[in-house]
C-alpha cells in the first residue's frame, strides 16, 4: 500500500527538490542515454526479474542505455519480430529460435540465461495427471498457439516412443486461458515452467497445484531461454557496441538477482503488480537453479557451451524434425558477453 507524505520545504531545500524533479523529467535522449528496446518472450513472470533489476538499479543507465522492456506473446511470434527487425533484440526459447533458423530466419543467440529445461506438466493437485509415463497417453494438455513448449514437447514424446497425437492438445489464445482450462478441469495439465505457473496459480487462486518436470520423466534436457538478435542489425553502425553494453548490464542484473533475491523480488513486484512477494521470490528461486550445465560451469553468466547446443540439436533433429545446421555457431555466439564482475568499461 502506498502512502503519500506532505513535505513542507523552504529555501534551498525546496529548490533542490524542484531541481531533482526536473532532472527526472528530462527525456533519456537529453540525458545522453540511447534507446534500446528489448522484447520478452511472454507476459511477465519471475524469470524476467533480472532485466528489471538491471534497469531499476541503474545498470543499463550506467552503460548509457535507456532500455525499454516490452512483454511478448510467445517465442514463435517474438522470433519472427526479431527476424523482421520489428524487435531486433529479444528473449525467446532456444529451441524455438533453432527451428526458426532452420526455416531461414536471420537470427542468433548471444546469451543463454536458462541452460536446463524447466518445461513441466502443471496440474491441479486434486486431479494430478500426468505424473508418470503411463498416464501421458490420452491426457488433455493445454497449450497456447505459438507456444515455445511445442518443440520440446514433441522431442519429449518422441524420446518416450510416443507422438504429440497421443495426447489431446487443447489450443487456447493466451496464457490466462491455458491456466483457466486446468483450473476449470477442461484440461488435465498445461505445459509450462515449474518455477512459474504452478506456484503462482496456487498462491493466486488457493487451488493446490502440482507439477512434473519433463526431464524427470525422460532424462532429456535442452538449452532454454536465450537473448537473440537479428543478424543484420548487429552489423549495422554501433549496434554491436550497444549490444555489448546491454549484455554486460544484463549479466550484472542476473548476478545481482542471484546474490540478492529478496531485493530482486521487491523490484520485480513494482513492475509486475499482479505478483506478490511470495510468488516473486518462489519464481526467482526456481529460475536460479537452472542457469548452468556441467559444460558451462565456471563460465560467465549466459555463456553457452558448444556441446550443449550439439546435444539440443541432436534431440530436436531426432524427435522433432529440426533441420540441423552443419555449423553450430549458426545458432549462437559468446563474443558479445562480458567477464565478471560485469561492470561498465571506463
Q: For the regions a protein language model found, what residue spans apply to each?
A:
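Pocket-lining segment of extracytoplasmic ligand-binding domains
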Residues: 95-96, 176-181, 186-274
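Surface-exposed patches in mature extracellular/periplasmic domains of secreted proteins
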Residues: 109, 169, 257-268, 325-328
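Secondary-structure end/capping motifs
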Residues: 237-319
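Conserved C-terminal helix/tail region of periplasmic/extracytoplasmic solute-binding proteins
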Residues: 309-346
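Short, glycine-/small- and polar/acidic-enriched structural segments
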Residues: 30-184, 188-195, 211-215, 221
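Sec/Tat signal peptide C-region and signal peptidase I cleavage site
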Residues: 21-30
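N-terminal export leaders
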Residues: 4-12
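Hydrophobic helical h-region of N-terminal Sec-dependent signal peptides
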Residues: 12-13, 17-20
Amino acid at each position: 500500500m502506498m502512502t503519500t507524505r506532505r513535505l513542507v520545504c523552504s529555501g534551498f531545500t525546496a529548490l533542490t527538490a524542484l531541481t531533482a524533479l526536473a532532472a527526472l523529467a528530462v527525456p533519456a535522449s537529453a540525458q545522453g542515454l540511447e534507446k534500446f528496446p528489448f522484447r520478452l518472450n511472454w507476459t511477465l513472470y519471475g524469470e524476467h526479474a533480472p532485466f528489471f533489476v538491471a534497469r531499476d538499479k541503474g545498470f543499463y543507465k550506467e552503460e548509457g542505455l535507456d532500455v525499454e522492456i516490452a512483454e511478448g506473446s510467445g517465442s514463435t511470434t517474438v522470433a519472427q519480430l526479431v527476424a523482421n527487425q520489428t524487435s531486433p533484440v529479444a528473449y525467446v526459447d532456444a529451441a524455438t529460435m533453432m527451428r526458426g533458423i532452420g526455416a531461414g530466419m536471420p537470427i542468433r543467440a548471444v546469451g543463454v540465461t536458462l541452460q536446463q529445461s524447466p518445461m513441466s506438466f502443471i496440474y491441479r493437485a486434486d486431479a494430478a495427471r500426468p505424473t508418470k509415463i503411463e498416464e501421458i497417453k490420452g491426457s488433455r494438455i493445454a497449450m497456447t498457439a505459438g507456444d515455445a513448449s511445442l518443440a520440446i514437447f514433441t522431442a519429449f514424446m518422441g524420446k518416450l516412443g510416443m507422438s504429440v497425437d497421443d495426447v489431446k492438445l487443447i489450443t487456447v489464445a493466451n496464457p490466462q486461458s491455458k491456466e483457466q482450462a486446468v483450473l476449470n478441469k477442461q484440461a488435465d495439465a498445461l505445459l509450462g515452467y515449474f518455477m512459474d505457473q504452478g506456484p503462482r496459480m496456487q498462491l493466486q487462486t488457493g487451488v493446490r497445484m502440482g507439477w512434473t518436470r519433463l526431464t524427470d520423466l525422460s532424462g532429456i534436457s535442452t538449452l532454454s531461454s536465450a537473448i537473440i538478435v537479428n543478424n543484420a542489425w548487429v552489423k549495422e553502425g554501433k549496434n554491436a557496441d550497444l549490444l555489448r553494453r546491454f549484455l554486460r548490464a544484463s549479466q550484472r542484473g542476473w548476478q545481482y538477482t542471484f546474490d540478492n533475491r529478496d531485493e530482486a523480488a521487491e523490484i520485480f513486484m513494482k513492475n509486475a503488480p499482479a505478483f506478490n512477494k511470495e510468488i516473486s521470490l518462489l519464481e526467482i528461486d526456481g529460475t536460479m537453479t537452472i542457469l548452468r550445465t556441467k559444460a558451462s560451469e565456471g563460465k560467465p553468466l549466459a555463456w553457452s557451451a558448444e556441446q550443449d547446443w550439439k546435444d539440443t540439436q541432436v534431440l530436436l533433429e531426432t524427435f522433432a524434425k529440426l533441420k540441423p545446421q552443419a555449423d553450430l555457431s549458426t545458432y549462437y555466439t559468446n563474443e558479445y558477453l562480458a567477464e565478471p564482475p560485469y561492470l561498465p568499461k571506463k
